[in-house]
Amino acid sequence: MKAPVRVAVTGAAGQIGYALLFRIASGEMLGKDQPVILQLLELPIEKAQAALKGVMMELEDCAFPLLAGMVGTDDAEVAFKDVDVALLVGSRPRGPGMERKDLLLANAEIFTAQGAALNKVAKRDVKVLVVGNPANTNAYIAMKSAPDLDPKNFTAMLRLDHNRALSQLSAKLGKPVAGIEKLAVWGNHSPTMYPDYRFATADGASIGDAINDQEWNASTFIPTVGKRGAAIIEARGLSSAASAANAAIDHIRDWVLGTSGKWVTMGVPSDGSYGIPEGVMFGFPVTTENGKYTIVKDLPIDDFSQKYIDKTLAELEEERSGVAHLLG
């Protein structure tokens, strides 16, 4: 049996946490031969800690062969101690009458503290995925608050947008998602992100050629993917939790186990590719191998695409400047 991997999950008793933990413990994220120790963080309030205890009781009752241990805590330094993987799911949701900038600042406080705790106690090669929104900027804040860790250790989740786009293309083409490759999603995990199928193929044939409908792309596909989260809240009365948890599992599994040359989308600190300023946490097409991701380079960006990329970048820059004063 392999040595256990330590996985931290914040917001562990929340909706996404509940949809996530059982799948991690069953081996869906890191492999069916990889034991895990779950290190679970919840808010230091009685109700949250009681809920966390209940979730841990359920995890015990599953008797997962791969679950080698569990810790439940309200202290980030306990939750992040020696972790190999950290899923930062917990964030402050937007309350009634709350402006986006208030939301940014409330979350900046959380992710500054979590970045500092990771910096202090996590493994030096920890893989961090920020799921809690605004995910890109929260990941940027955590990264900036962990000066001793490699910035490449920090990522934001755009896999939900990627998977949503895959599913829309599959429905449009009447072809299974499994055959679709080379899809890209650029930018922020927000309605400004740009799902781009110009390079994508279904069973090896160009999707752009098969659809050949720029009107559908601009007025149906892009807005449907961008506003899917809102559509789910409208229908379900709750935000997408199971699909977000599924995307988090996909993101970490691919980062750790590799994509065998296939493109996936990750929010990563820019290296200057495609004119995105260095350090901006931006969605790019990537491939992964041996626990490292590589941005897919030198794709042609046409005027239509550039307009969308500029728009999502402008939003990220605005978010970044809104929290700059907190990061020194």
Swiss-Prot record:
Enzyme Commission (EC) number: 1.1.1.37
For this UniProt entry, the molecular function terms from Gene Ontology, in alphabetical order, are:
L-malate dehydrogenase (NAD+) activity
Q: List, alphabetically, the CDD domains matched.
A: MDH_chloroplast-like (cd01338)
Catalytic residues as annotated in Swiss-Prot or TrEMBL: 189 (proton acceptor)
Residues recorded as binding substrate, renumbered to this chain, are 94, 100, 133, 164
Q: Kindly give the InterPro entries that the UniProt entry links to this protein.
A: L-lactate/malate_DH, Lactate/malate_DH_C, Lactate/malate_DH_N, Lactate_DH/Glyco_Ohase_4_C, Malate_DH_type2, NAD(P)-bd_dom_sf
Keyword annotations:
NAD, Oxidoreductase, Tricarboxylic acid cycle
Q: Which Gene3D superfamilies match?
A: Lactate dehydrogenase/glycoside hydrolase, family 4, C-terminal, NAD(P)-binding Rossmann-like Domain
Q: Name one Pfam family in it.
A: Ldh_1_N
Quote the record's binding site residues for NAD(+). Answer: 11-17, 107, 114, 131-133
What catalytic activity is recorded? (S)-malate + NAD(+) = oxaloacetate + NADH + H(+)
- Could you give a single Gene Ontology term from the biological process aspect? tricarboxylic acid cycle
Describe the family membership recorded for this protein in Swiss-Prot or TrEMBL.
Belongs to the LDH/MDH superfamily. MDH type 2 family.
Q: What does this protein do?
A: Catalyzes the reversible oxidation of malate to oxaloacetate.
User: What is the protein name given in its UniProt record?
Assistant: Malate dehydrogenase
Q: What is the scientific name of the source organism? A: Xanthomonas axonopodis pv. citri (strain 306)
Taxonomic lineage: Bacteria, Pseudomonadati, Pseudomonadota, Gammaproteobacteria, Lysobacterales
